[in-house]
């Protein structure tokens, strides 16, 4: 009998991607985050779609429409908080996924890695424009501060900012276009994710050892489908716990005050997942320098494959590199903490030191230590 799964043009694509895909037999739970990101994306698109049915992208009614969703729409509060906290889960999975790639040398699949960096930037853009939509105080001032950074670009900066705003300040036109961007970007992310997967399946997955696993592959289904389902259950459990018990834990109380251009909040700060980059931005006293550092803090990921000096792909057997990797994680956590603190002593100097350490670790220390490890192994 002919198996339709292997012959039908559409089923064949799905089969080769999720069922008969040869997968290394030793990949750990750190490889779960790819599928979890897919799950997050689907959840965000679905909850977002239902929110868009009731939301109005107009400065006079946006805040009220979000209140209306929470009060009057059936399970509207649940959909809204699933969407808001779903974004946090998305970024947790995203950072874990990138961390896994850095630790195990997955960045050596350069096409996959570069599409991944592009995906990160697109998700960050989506989260930023989405945060503006409830039109609370932090929405308005966050949009004002972050879009204003573009004015640091020489010559065209001011014109560019006014072009993005659609006027001379963040107003009705800005909110409308941000809603349009927030609606379209997830579909672009979906397309990019498909390309990301396409490139990955050209090479096959990496594994914790970093050694080619062509001679030891197992089918994706049932081994990793069941493992992914377990991961998905944990993710959903965490998301539901957050949404039902502490929906506002990760949010900002200022966003429950309607946007007011005449009153600036005491501390303007983005959502927690952008705080590390915000801390790097603030650590440089010069506007253009800060913007460049902010950009480089993310775009530095593109250069990681070029900074690989070790003759081993993974950090599994490299204790000194492991130490530096976890120092980098600690540094990023420090930056995240600093980003949420007011601009005063001692936070300023701690932020500056953490920012310097971030770039020094990636650009200097890690490549140097990799070379030393090669020497120690007489390679």
Curated annotation (Swiss-Prot):
Cofactor descriptive note: Binds 2 heme b groups non-covalently.
Membrane topology designation: Multi-pass membrane protein
GO annotations of cellular component type: mitochondrial inner membrane; respiratory chain complex III
InterPro entries in the cross-refs: Cyt_b/b6_C, Cyt_b/b6_C_sf, Cyt_b/b6_N, Cytb/b6-like_sf, Cytochrome_b, Cytochrome_b_C_euk/bac, Cytochrome_b_N_euk/bac, Di-haem_cyt_TM
Segments traversing the membrane: 33-53, 77-98, 113-133, 178-198, 226-246, 288-308, 320-340, 347-367
Binding site for heme b b566: 97, 196
Additional facts recorded: Heme 1 (or BL or b562) is low-potential and absorbs at about 562 nm, and heme 2 (or BH or b566) is high-potential and absorbs at about 566 nm.
The protein's name: Cytochrome b
Organism: Cephalorhynchus heavisidii
Taxonomic path: Eukaryota, Metazoa, Chordata, Craniata, Vertebrata
Gene: MT-CYB
């Amino acid at each position: 009998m002919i198996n339709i799964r292997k012959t039908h043009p559409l089923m064949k694509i799905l089969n080769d991607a999720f069922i008969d895909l040869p997968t290394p037999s030793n990949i750990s739970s750190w490889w779960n985050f790819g599928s979890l990101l897919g799950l997050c994306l689907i959840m965000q698109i679905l909850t977002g779609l239902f929110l868009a049915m009731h939301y109005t992208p107009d400065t006079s009614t946006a805040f009220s429409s979000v209140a209306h969703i929470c009060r009057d729409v059936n399970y509207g509060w649940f959909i809204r908080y699933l969407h808001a906290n779903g974004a946090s889960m998305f970024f947790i999975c995203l950072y874990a996924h990138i961390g896994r790639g850095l630790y195990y040398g997955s960045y050596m699949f350069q096409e996959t890695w570069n599409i991944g960096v592009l995906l990160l930037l697109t998700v960050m853009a989506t989260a930023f424009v989405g945060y503006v939509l409830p039109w609370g105080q932090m929405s308005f001032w966050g949009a004002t501060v972050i879009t204003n950074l573009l004015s640091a670009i020489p010559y065209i900066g001011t014109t560019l900012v006014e072009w993005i705003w659609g006027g001379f300040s963040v107003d009705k036109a800005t909110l409308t276009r941000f809603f349009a961007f927030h609606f379209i970007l997830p579909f672009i992310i979906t397309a990019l994710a498909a390309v990301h997967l396409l490139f990955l399946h050209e090479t096959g997955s990496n594994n914790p050892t970093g050694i080619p696993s062509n001679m030891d592959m197992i089918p994706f289904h049932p081994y990793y489908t069941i493992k992914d389902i377990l991961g998905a259950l944990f993710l959903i459990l965490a998301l539901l716990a957050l949404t039902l018990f502490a929906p506002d834990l990760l949010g900002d109380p200022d966003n429950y005050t309607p946007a007011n251009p005449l009153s600036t909040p005491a501390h303007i700060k983005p959502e927690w997942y952008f705080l590390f980059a915000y801390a790097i931005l603030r650590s440089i006293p010069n506007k253009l320098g800060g913007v460049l550092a902010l950009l480089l803090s993310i775009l530095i990921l593109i250069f990681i494959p070029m900074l690989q000096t070790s003759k081993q792909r993974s950090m599994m057997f490299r204790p000194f590199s492991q130490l530096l990797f976890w120092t980098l994680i600690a540094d990023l956590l420090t930056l995240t903490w600093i980003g949420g603190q007011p601009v005063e002593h001692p936070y300023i100097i701690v932020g500056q030191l953490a920012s310097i350490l971030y770039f020094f670790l990636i650009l200097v220390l890690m490549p140097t230590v990799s070379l030393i490890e090669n020497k120690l192994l007489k390679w």
